[in-house]
C-alpha cells in the first residue's frame, strides 16, 4: 500500500532485509607512485576501510588563510570550454600501457605452460601455484624486482664543498642616497604609530614581530620619503610597503573618488598574492583595492576602475591597456608608486612599458622600489625618478635565506642526458613532497610534467604557455597539497610565497646569480628551514664557484649512485613512446577545439548575418604592430626566434625542425643551458656599455682620488741616506731586521739580548 503511494515503509522485526555483498577491490587498481616494495606493502596493511581516503580537514594549519581572496579572483577568470586536463591524458596512457603489459605477461605465461606440458606433474602443480600467487599480487606489484630494490635503496653521499676565504668588500654608502640600513632591533608593530584597524588586522593575520626589512622600511615610509630597498626573498617586503601606504590612506582620507596608490608587479601570480595580502591588511578599514592583471576578465576590471579604488595592483601590460582603452581611468592622481621586484620590472622586456607608465604618472609622488637584487637599471631609475631617496640594504644583493641548505649535483662531461634521470631519482627516492622544480624553458617544464606523471607522481606545471585559469589552478592545488611537485619556469621564481615549500630543484643553473637567488628564495622563507638542489654541468662551474664563494653556510655536494641513475635512465627511455602518445592526444584536442571554434563562428554568421554580429572595437596600444614586432625581434635570444619576421621563415624553420626529428636527452639539456648562457651573454654585453652622461650627479658617490695601494718596502740608496725622520733613525739604530738578516745570510741575533741570566749574578768564588 505504502509502496503504491510512493512512500517508504517501516521495517518490522520479522521482515528479512537482503544485505548487499561488499564490493570486491580486486578490480584494476591505479598504479601508485614508484614506492619500493616493502614500503608499499606497509602502506597496504595500514589502510582502513572505516575512513574515506579522500577525506581532508577543512581547517588548515596556520593563523590565517588567503583562500577567500583567491576565490574572488578565480570568479573573474575568463570562462572557457572544459577540456580534458593533461593529468587525465597521462592517466589514460598509463592505463593503456598497464593493460598492454598485463596482456604481454599473460601471453608469456601461456607460452611457458605450453613449453612445460611434457614435464612432470609436480612441476606443473608448482607452476599453477606460482600463477595463482602472481595473479593475487598483480595489484600491489611494483615496477622493480628485489635486485632493483637493493640498487635503489642505496643512499646518496653528501660532501662539504670547500671554499676559498676572501675578505668581503664593504658597500660604500652613496652620496645621492641617505642610508637607513641601521634600524632599532627592539621595534615592534605597536611602536610604529600604526592605526588601530591596521594593528587589529596584523594580529588577525598572526604577525607577532616585524622582520628586519619591515623595521627599517615602515618608519621611513610613514615619513613620506622615497625608498630604494633591497632585502633577501621571503623577508616580508609586501607588508613593508603595504602598511605605510594603508596608514597614509587612513590618516588622509580622499576628497574625491580617485586612485591614489599604484603597485606594479612583474607577474600575474605575484599580483594576485600582493592583492590578497593588501586586502587582508585592509580588512578593518574602509579602503578599496583593485587587481588589474592579464588573464582576468577585462570588462569587470574596467567596471572596478571606474569606481576609482584607493589601491590598484597591476602588471605593466594590462595597466597600459586600461590607460589607452578606459576613458575615465588615468594616473595623474597617483600619490604613491610602488615597484615590487623592481629589478625584473626594469629589465629589457618591460623597458618600453615602464617608460610609458612613469611618463603618465603624477610627478608629485612618493616612490618605493623593492627588490631582492639591486641592478644598474634600478639605480638608473632611482637617480631619475626618486627625490632624495633613502637606501635600505638589509641583506647583500646575493644573499640567500639564512636557513637554506644548498646542495649541488655534478653532471660529468658527456653525461648531460642524465639530468632527467637524476631529477626523477631525487623526486622518487628522496624529495617526495612540497617540491618546486625549475626549468629554463616552457617545453622542458611540460615534458617533465608528463614524465613524472607517467611515473605515478602527483605533478603540476606553471609557465607562460598555460591559460590564466590553468596557472591559478596549478598554484591552488600545490598550496592545498593536492599535488606534491610543481614544475615551473622563472615565472614562478619571483615573490611567490607558497607556504611549506621544503625543496627547490634546479634542472639547469639559471641565467645569472640574481635569478638563482630568486629561485631558491621560494623555500626557507620567513625564518623556516629549506633545501635547494642544483644540477651543475661543466659549462656552469663558474657560477657554482661564485655561489660557493658568497655562501655563508657550508655548501654540500650530493652524489647519486651510478646504478640508480642508469635504472631511471632506462625507465625514461621505455617511457618515450608514452610521452609521445600524450603529446599526440594534446595536439588532437587542440585541433578539435580550433575546428569547433571555426564551425561556431560560421554558424553564428549564417544565423544572424555578417552585419548583425556586433564586433567590439579593437583595443589600442601605445606601440604600433610594426614597432612591437621590431622590439620582439630585437630581443630574440636565438636565431630560430627570428622566424617571427615572416611566414616564409617560420615555415622553413618548422620544416627543418620536423626533418631533424625528436631531440635526444643530451640535446634537450644542452638547449636549456644554451638559453641560459645566451641570456647571460647579452646581460654582460649590456653591462659593458658606457653609462649615460648626466648633468646631475648619479646615485654613485663621487669618489676621490684612488688610494694608492701600499707597496712592499723598496730599498733605495739615496732615500736611506737622506731620510732623517724619526722612524728612519730608529730603524737605522736598530740595524737590519730578522727577515733582512735571513735574506742576507747574516748570523741570527739572539732574541731578548738585553735579558741577563742568573749566571751573571753568581758570586765569584
Curated annotation (Swiss-Prot):
Compositionally biased residues, Basic residues: 716-725
Reaction(s) this enzyme catalyzes, per UniProt: ATP + H2O = ADP + phosphate + H(+)
Location of this chain's protein in the cell: Nucleus, Nucleolus; Chromosome
EC number: 3.6.4.13
Keywords recorded for this protein, A-Z: ATP-binding, Chromosome, Helicase, Hydrolase, Nucleotide-binding, Nucleus, Phosphoprotein, Ribosome biogenesis, rRNA processing
Motif (Nuclear localization signal): 164-169
GO biological process: rRNA processing
Enzyme's top EC category: hydrolase
Gene3D superfamilies (alphabetical): P-loop containing nucleotide triphosphate hydrolases
Sequence motif DEAD box, location on chain: 340-343
CC per GO annotation: chromosome; nucleolus
Name of protein: Probable ATP-dependent RNA helicase DDX27
Gene: DDX27
Amino acid at each position: 500500500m505504502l509502496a503504491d503511494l510512493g512512500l517508504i515503509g517501516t521495517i518490522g522485526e520479522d521482515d528479512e532485509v537482503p544485505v548487499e555483498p561488499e564490493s570486491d577491490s580486486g578490480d584494476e587498481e591505479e598504479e601508485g607512485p614508484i614506492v619500493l616494495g616493502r614500503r608499499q606493502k606497509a602502506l597496504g596493511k595500514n589502510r582502513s576501510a572505516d575512513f574515506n581516503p579522500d577525506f581532508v580537514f577543512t581547517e588548515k594549519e596556520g593563523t590565517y588563510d588567503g583562500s577567500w581572496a583567491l576565490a574572488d579572483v578565480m570568479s573573474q577568470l575568463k570562462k572557457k570550454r572544459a577540456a580534458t586536463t593533461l593529468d587525465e591524458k597521462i592517466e589514460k596512457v598509463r592505463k593503456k600501457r598497464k593493460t598492454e603489459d598485463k596482456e604481454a605477461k599473460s601471453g608469456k605465461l601461456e607460452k611457458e605452460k605450453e613449453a612445460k606440458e611434457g614435464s612432470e606433474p609436480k612441476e606443473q602443480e608448482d607452476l599453477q601455484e606460482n600463477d595463482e600467487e602472481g595473479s593475487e599480487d598483480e595489484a600491489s606489484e611494483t615496477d622493480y624486482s628485489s635486485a632493483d630494490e637493493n640498487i635503489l635503496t642505496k643512499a646518496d653521499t653528501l660532501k662539504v664543498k670547500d671554499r676559498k676565504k676572501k675578505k668581503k668588500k664593504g658597500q660604500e654608502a652613496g652620496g645621492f642616497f641617505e642610508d637607513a640600513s641601521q634600524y632599532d632591533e627592539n621595534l615592534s608593530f605597536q611602536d610604529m604609530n600604526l592605526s588601530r584597524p591596521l594593528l587589529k588586522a596584523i594580529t588577525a593575520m598572526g604577525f607577532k614581530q616585524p622582520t628586519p626589512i619591515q623595521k627599517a622600511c615602515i618608519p621611513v615610509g610613514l615619513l613620506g620619503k622615497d625608498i630604494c630597498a633591497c632585502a633577501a626573498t621571503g623577508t616580508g617586503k609586501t607588508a613593508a610597503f603595504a602598511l605605510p601606504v594603508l596608514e597614509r590612506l587612513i590618516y588622509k582620507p580622499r576628497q574625491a573618488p580617485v586612485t591614489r596608490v599604484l603597485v606594479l608587479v612583474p607577474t600575474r601570480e605575484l599580483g594576485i598574492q600582493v592583492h590578497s595580502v593588501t586586502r587582508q591588511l585592509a580588512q578593518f578599514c574602509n579602503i578599496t583595492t583593485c587587481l588589474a592583471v592579464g588573464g582576468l576578465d577585462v570588462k569587470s576590471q574596467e567596471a572596478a576602475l571606474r569606481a576609482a579604488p584607493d589601491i590598484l595592483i597591476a602588471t605593466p601590460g594590462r595597466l597600459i591597456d586600461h590607460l589607452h582603452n578606459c576613458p575615465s581611468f588615468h594616473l595623474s592622481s597617483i600619490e604613491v608608486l610602488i615597484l615590487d621586484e623592481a629589478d625584473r620590472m626594469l629589465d629589457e622586456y618591460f623597458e618600453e612599458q615602464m617608460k610609458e607608465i612613469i611618463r603618465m604618472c603624477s610627478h608629485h609622488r612618493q616612490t618605493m622600489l623593492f627588490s631582492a637584487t639591486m641592478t644598474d637599471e634600478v639605480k638608473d631609475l632611482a637617480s631619475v625618478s626618486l627625490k632624495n631617496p633613502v637606501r635600505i640594504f638589509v641583506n647583500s644583493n646575493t644573499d640567500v635565506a639564512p636557513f637554506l641548505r644548498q646542495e649541488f649535483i655534478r653532471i660529468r662531461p658527456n653525461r648531460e642526458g642524465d639530468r632527467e634521470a637524476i631529477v626523477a631519482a631525487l623526486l622518487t627516492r628522496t624529495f617526495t613532497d612540497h617540491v618546486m622544480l625549475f626549468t629554463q624553458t616552457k617545453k622542458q617544464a611540460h615534458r617533465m610534467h608528463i614524465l613524472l606523471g607517467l611515473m605515478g607522481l602527483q605533478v603540476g606545471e606553471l609557465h607562460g604557455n598555460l591559460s590564466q585559469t590553468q596557472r591559478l589552478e596549478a598554484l591552488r592545488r600545490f598550496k592545498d597539497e593536492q599535488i606534491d611537485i610543481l614544475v615551473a619556469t622563472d615565472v614562478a621564481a619571483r615573490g611567490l610565497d607558497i607556504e611549506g615549500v621544503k625543496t627547490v630543484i634546479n634542472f639547469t643553473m639559471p641565467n645569472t646569480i640574481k635569478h638563482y637567488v630568486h629561485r631558491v628564495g621560494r623555500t626557507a622563507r620567513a625564518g623556516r628551514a629549506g633545501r635547494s638542489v642544483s644540477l651543475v654541468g661543466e659549462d656552469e662551474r663558474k657560477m657554482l664557484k661564485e655561489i660557493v664563494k658568497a655562501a655563508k653556510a657550508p655548501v654540500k655536494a650530493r652524489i647519486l649512485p651510478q646504478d640508480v641513475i642508469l635504472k631511471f635512465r632506462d625507465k625514461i627511455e621505455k617511457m618515450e613512446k608514452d610521452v609521445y602518445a600524450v603529446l599526440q592526444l594534446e595536439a588532437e584536442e587542440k585541433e578539435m577545439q580550433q575546428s569547433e571554434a571555426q564551425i561556431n563562428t560560421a554558424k553564428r554568421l549564417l544565423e544572424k548575418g555578417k552585419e548583425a554580429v556586433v564586433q567590439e572595437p579593437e583595443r589600442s596600444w601605445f606601440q604600433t604592430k610594426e614597432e612591437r614586432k621590431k622590439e620582439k625581434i630585437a630581443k630574440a635570444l636565438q636565431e630560430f626566434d627570428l622566424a617571427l619576421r615572416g611566414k616564409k621563415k617560420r615555415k622553413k624553420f618548422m620544416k627543418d625542425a620536423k626533418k631533424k626529428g625528436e631531440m635526444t636527452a643530451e640535446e634537450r639539456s644542452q638547449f636549456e643551458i644554451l638559453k641560459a648562457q645566451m641570456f647571460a651573454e647579452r646581460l654582460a654585453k649590456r653591462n659593458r656599455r658606457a653609462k649615460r652622461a648626466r648633468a646631475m650627479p648619479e646615485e654613485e658617490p663621487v669618489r676621490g682620488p684612488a688610494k694608492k695601494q701600499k707597496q712592499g718596502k723598496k730599498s733605495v740608496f739615496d732615500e736611506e741616506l737622506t731620510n732623517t725622520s724619526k722612524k728612519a733613525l730608529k730603524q737605522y739604530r736598530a740595524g737590519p731586521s730578522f727577515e733582512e738578516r735571513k735574506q742576507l745570510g747574516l748570523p741570527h741575533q739572539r732574541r731578548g739580548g738585553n735579558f741577563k741570566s742568573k749566571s751573571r749574578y753568581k758570586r765569584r768564588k
